[in-house]
A protein has these predicted regions:
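Conserved donor-binding/catalytic core segment of Leloir-type glycosyltransferases
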Residues: 18, 38-55, 61-64
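A short helix/loop element that forms part of the nucleotide-sugar donor recognition site in Leloir-type
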Residues: 24-37, 158
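Short alpha-helical donor nucleotide-sugar binding micro-motif in glycosyltransferases
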Residues: 85-90
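Aromatic "clamp/platform" in nucleotide-sugar-dependent glycosyltransferases that forms part
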Residues: 98
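Short hydrophobic beta-strand element within catalytic cores of glycosyltransferases
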Residues: 115-118
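Conserved acidic donor-binding segment of nucleotide-sugar-dependent glycosyltransferases
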Residues: 130-142, 150-153
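A charged, aromatic-enriched C-terminal amphipathic alpha-helix characteristic of glycosyltransferases
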Residues: 155-182
Length: 185
């Protein structure tokens, strides 16, 4: 607030970058094969561990309770390469968190053109603005359920990669370097 406004001319916000060389769209069925996922199901990737209370897995599970052919996957214990495969193998990333900073997982999903359903946390609303098959939702299981149905019936990926191209690691490194140069002058 007041303290921050005193230093606003000396403040620079640099977001977390995304490895756009790794997180990119690849074939869904090939990704499922590599992960051992059945082609006969729809998959929704939960953004974190089910045990993390802030991430609100209960809401995601409730929203999916009326579906028989959907498997909710927990993003826990995967390498970065496996997360990339997951983003391409699943039909939807779901974020039902009570709070977030970024979240980086949304940027990675966008880079893979993975459809997203998210509560209004962190900078998700700004990131998803104008992106096809990316929805900001209330903490309402029925609303989330409807958005899941919308995405599955469209049978389309998102067009999110363009929304995160300025979060590439090279761009972020250049931004950090620029800040250091200004500070050292």
């Amino acid at each position: 607030s007041k303290k921050l406004s005193l230093f606003s001319d000396k403040t620079e916000i640099i977001p977390c970058g995304v490895n756009l060389n790794l997180f990119k769209p690849i074939d869904k069925l090939a990704s499922r094969d590599k992960l051992g996922l059945d082609h006969n199901y729809n998959y929704v990737l939960f953004s974190s561990s089910f045990n993390n209370k802030i991430k609100n897995a209960a809401l995601a599970k409730l929203a999916l309770s009326n579906f028989e052919n959907i498997i909710l996957l927990e993003m826990k214990g995967y390498s970065r390469e496996e997360v990339h495969l997951l983003m391409n193998a699943v039909d939807i990333l779901i974020v039902t968190s009570h709070s977030e900073t970024g979240p980086l997982v949304v940027k990675e999903a966008l880079a893979c053109n993975c459809p997203i359903i998210s509560t209004d946390v962190g900078d998700v609303k700004e990131l998803a603005k104008g992106v096809e098959n990316c929805y900001i939702v209330d903490y309402d299981a029925k609303h989330i359920e409807q958005r899941i149905r919308d995405i599955l019936s469209s049978n389309k990926k998102s067009d999110g990669r363009a929304a995160v191209k300025h979060f590439g690691l090279e761009k972020i490194a250049t931004d950090v370097y620029s800040v250091y140069k200004r500070v050292l002058k």
